[in-house]
């Protein structure tokens, strides 16, 4: 055993310096894989105008990558309660384009698949890696996203279902356009 006084200097620990690269992405995915990744340019604020442009691109990607869902209008958008998602112009855009939205309870990151599954998975895979450029960060993150298996995504959506049902059972019911629904209707 080694004794130290309260005046002894602290033991030095090696710490990794913070990265000089900060990347923000907006990701849309379903049980079959990633549909669209938008890399937000450095210095860009994600406001309602920017988000509407993202949604326009998303619609095109759904049409091309999920034609069966596009034809049947069987895809539902789930996003959290960020101000740009709830802006009147965004809500009008969604209504005009017949994009159904699954409401998200306020202040509930535990109910957002990106927050409890996707971003932690990517962050832990990138932790400790040094990148030479922003393009290298984007390439690695995109590769990680595209390498998610259907089992990974199935697990994510099963966890989401469990979390949402727990919320509903605790009187935090979920509605879509004023109609209460069972979450099992959306999961296979």
What is each PLM-predicted segment?
Residues 1-188:
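Surface/interface recognition patches
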